[in-house]
Design a protein with these regions (language model features):
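Short, mixed-charge, low-aromatic patches
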Residues: 13-20, 47, 151-161, 201, ...
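Short, charged/polar micro-motifs that form catalytic or ligand-binding hotspots
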Residues: 19, 190, 232
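Intrinsically disordered, low-complexity acidic/polar segments
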Residues: 16, 130-132, 294
């Protein structure tokens, strides 16, 4: 029996729209949490001024794919929780949590694990290797009940954790702090993101945190750039069909029309969450769209 499951969805608003593969990974986080009667919450990296204008558009897209009622308010929510969008979704805003980040930055400084260069602050991997060795075990789960291990040799390189003289913290540092603060148990993402696990594992161990489980799911591919929601709706595909298609790629029934998340959750098995890849199938999406169109009520 698994412990209480807590997952999180992390948005980096570098673009006003994300492609379908990103939203599929978000949905897998929700399916895993809800299957085990757990929680999932939203975290927003809003510290780059150039990306601020994209947040509202991303929230609009997100709430079309993930029902707002499925997102929970984080526990231990001492600071940085705001309500966003027309549905007032609780979300952690990174820009409001600097005091906590600075606390842990100071801890790393006390352990002489930081290097200051120009206006940036780097984690000193060379010093870490002196203390802990140059091999790091990346524990991950290919399925919620099946663990794996990848051992990597660490390069003697530095990686940045803060810029602007410590006034802006980078995602792979801030997310580690927040995941610990909010008791996140599982990080769910596509297998192509496994390299992100290296700095996150290093930081977790250097700070004495309990490592979350890393669960990897399939990568959605396409012979062309993956479509965004706005691209598909412009062709007449409904949000309901897009959502149903994504549900189906997770349950293994991509041509089955799903009218609700609860219906899809009944077909969901954690065993279906495996690393690998699959291709976006526009014809299957069109088939789902046709089904919804044929089953519309006259008043719809």
């Amino acid at each position: 029996m698994l412990e209480r499951i807590v997952t999180r969805i992390g948005i980096s608003p570098f673009s006003a729209q994300q492609h379908l593969g990103v939203y599929r990974s978000f949905l897998v986080s929700v399916f895993i949490a809800k299957h085990f009667n757990g929680e999932t919450f939203l975290r927003i990296d809003d510290t780059n001024p150039r990306h601020q204008a994209n947040i509202d558009a991303l929230i609009d897209d997100l709430t079309q794919i993930i029902e707002p009622s499925l997102l929970d308010s984080p526990r231990n929510s001492e600071t940085g929780i705001y309500y966003v969008g027309s549905d007032s979704i609780p979300a952690i805003f990174e820009s409001q949590r600097f005091e906590l980040y600075r606390k842990y930055l100071n801890i790393l400084q006390e352990h002489e694990l930081l290097i200051h260069e120009a206006d940036a602050i780097y984690f000193d991997t060379k010093k870490y290797i002196e203390l802990y060795g140059d091999l790091i075990d990346l524990q991950y789960q290919s399925k919620p009940y099946r663990s794996g291990l990848i051992t990597k040799s660490l390069p003697q390189l530095y990686f940045p954790i803060a810029v602007d003289n410590g006034r802006r913290f980078l995602w792979h540092f801030a997310s580690v702090i927040d995941d610990n603060a909010f008791d996140v148990t599982h990080i769910v993402r596509a297998k192509d993101k496994i390299d992100n696990q290296v700095p996150q594992t290093i930081l977790n161990r250097a700070l004495g945190f309990t490592l979350p489980q890393y669960l990897y799911t399939k990568i959605m591919l396409s012979g062309h750039p993956l479509p965004k929601i706005i691209d598909l709706t412009a062709t007449g595909i409904s949000i309901q069909a897009i959502r149903s298609y994504l549900y189906g790629t997770i349950t293994g029934n991509s041509e089955k029309p799903y009218f609700s998340f609860e219906e899809a959750l009944m077909d969901f098995s954690p065993k279906s969450v495996t690393p690998g890849q699959f291709y976006f199938d526009f014809k299957k999406l069109q088939s789902v769209q046709k089904h919804f169109f044929n089953h519309q009520k006259p008043s719809d």
